[in-house]
């Protein structure tokens, strides 16, 4: 290392090994600018603290990665480490504008030129920057001493418990009050008025016990009410589950009549059955008229598909295809 040479460091992305010659080309380029590469480390070694950098040692630090400019990823926590390892006015290359805020926060000055030589420079005096502690101008309550919380002299308001004897009484409405209210609205039904009169006529004590037998009328036990099959919401009357009026028998009779009509199958005579017969000459044939010629001439819905060719009027023999059956 000569007097005019400057010390440099290369931080290598692990994927650089996939691009042969990239590292050597970068070393040659930096050597032409009078930089001597004293160290080179993998970025993951620096990230997991396997390697530590000395403070104010390097004039240049270069982050070498094969990633595209818009896809570069870098651990942000290493930016202050790099700033500490650079000398004053030292340069850091390899990152983009995406990390601009982190660079400014950590005391870098951004240099952007037209020949894609984008880099950061460690500003003078950034290493001696001190944190300024802010103090509040106003004091709340007593002064805060020795980290204790402030105290307040004002007391919280107190409330007295309400006496049990001052409970509100229930307001009862008389029939006259209800009638006055109903007169104001002529559209109210008379049913509401009759209900009000009924409940007002009851003079039962709330604490008195009521015998349930007194609520049963003398006519309630005269007899059992028979449930008869009546009309339902459906259009047609249907029998109940335990029908005793004969409705269930009528429904069963109707179902039997329907089944009897369904059992009557339409009977065809022999002439009607042979009205369309492809095996009898002179009878009507299908639309294609080629049913007897074989599968090559038959329609897709022909009933003779798969059978051998035959002459009209000749009985069909399956002996020719017995080997296939």
From Swiss-Prot:
[2Fe-2S] cluster binds at residues 229, 240, 243, 245. GO terms for biological process: cellular response to oxidative stress; iron-sulfur cluster assembly; negative regulation of hydrogen peroxide-mediated programmed cell death; negative regulation of nitric oxide biosynthetic process. A motif (Cx2C motif 1) lies at residues 288-291. Its cofactor is [2Fe-2S] cluster; [4Fe-4S] cluster. Residues 170-222 are annotated as: Linker. Residues 229-245 are annotated as: Fe-S binding site A. One of its GO terms (cellular component) is cytosolic [4Fe-4S] assembly targeting complex. Residues 288-302 are annotated as: Fe-S binding site B. The C-terminal domain binds 2 Fe-S clusters but is otherwise mostly in an intrinsically disordered conformation. The N-terminal domain has structural similarity with S-adenosyl-L-methionine-dependent methyltransferases, but does not bind S-adenosyl-L-methionine. It is required for correct assembly of the 2 Fe-S clusters. Belongs to the anamorsin family. Monomer. Interacts with TAH18. Interacts with MIA40. This is Fe-S cluster assembly protein DRE2. It comes from Vanderwaltozyma polyspora (strain ATCC 22028 / DSM 70294 / BCRC 21397 / CBS 2163 / NBRC 10782 / NRRL Y-8283 / UCD 57-17) (Kluyveromyces polysporus). The lineage of its organism: Eukaryota, Fungi, Dikarya, Ascomycota, Saccharomycotina.
